[in-house]
């Protein structure tokens, strides 16, 4: 008897491969790395900075994301590397996806509490929050099948 496939199971099968995920990882992980380099070197024009960007508390808040974002980049880029070299990429991909979603959620939570709405900050952070949710079920399903 053939096992009945649900919509979620089919979605999980499609989202458990590195095929499309690697593009997301490359964009997000290289984007984070670029953002932090540009931020550290003060290369962004003032018009693109968040409100009160000179306030030391907000500067600290922004830099508090650095370890999280760099860990996202390291795990995401490593999972792409591991997938090409026969390694166990799924665990690192799952870590990267969860941390990416957390990073987006934390930023949006702050902007919500601050009562600030700027599409330039909301759109990318909304994508960081949501896009991993399409891949996490498939990665988890793939990990369950391997164990």
Residue ranges and their predicted role:
Residues 4-34, 57:
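Cytosolic juxtamembrane helix and N-cap/initiation of the first transmembrane helix
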Residues 74-94:
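Juxtamembrane helix-break-helix junctions at the cytosolic face
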């Amino acid at each position: 008897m053939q096992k009945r496939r649900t919509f979620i199971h089919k979605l999980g099968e499609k989202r458990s491969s590195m095929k499309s995920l690697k593009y997301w990882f490359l964009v997000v992980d290289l984007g984070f790395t670029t953002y932090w380099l540009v931020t550290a070197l003060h290369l962004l024009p003032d018009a693109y900075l968040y409100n009160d960007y000179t306030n030391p508390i907000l500067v600290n808040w922004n830099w508090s994301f650095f370890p999280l974002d760099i860990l996202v980049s390291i795990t995401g880029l490593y999972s792409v590397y591991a997938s090409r070299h026969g390694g166990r990429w799924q665990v690192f991909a799952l870590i990267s996806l969860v941390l990416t979603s957390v990073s987006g959620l934390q930023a949006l939570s702050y902007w919500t509490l601050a009562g600030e709405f700027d599409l330039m900050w909301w759109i990318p952070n909304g994508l960081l929050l949501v896009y991993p949710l399409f891949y996490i079920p498939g990665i988890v399903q793939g990990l369950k099948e391997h164990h």
